[in-house]
Amino acid sequence: MALLDFFLSRKKTTANIAKERLQIIVAERRRGDNEPHYLPQLKRDILEVICRYVQIDPEMVTVQLEQKGDDISVLELNVTLPEAEETPK
């Protein structure tokens, strides 16, 4: 039966291929559009406050916003601090 299925199977039309690609693009954009407009400014403000106390590379701070359900958002902040320098006694 596999041989019969091979000859009778229809190839995907270009319309179906285009539809699948469009669905992938739309899904990727939706995932990226969930980020609020204030998040980059919030990251800059947090980095500015941290830099008042510790010399830090801006790449060592990550801010992510996760959507947990319809009405719950979780803001995750990860800061990699440099090694503490020993002070002479």
From Swiss-Prot:
Cell cycle recorded as keyword: yes
Keywords: Cell cycle, Cell division
Signal peptide annotation: none
BP terms from Gene Ontology: cell division; regulation of division septum assembly
Family assignment from sequence similarity: Belongs to the MinE family.
Biological function: Prevents the cell division inhibition by proteins MinC and MinD at internal division sites while permitting inhibition at polar sites. This ensures cell division at the proper site by restricting the formation of a division septum at the midpoint of the long axis of the cell.
NCBIfam families per the UniProt record, alphabetical: minE, PRK00296.1
Name the UniProt record assigns to this protein: Cell division topological specificity factor
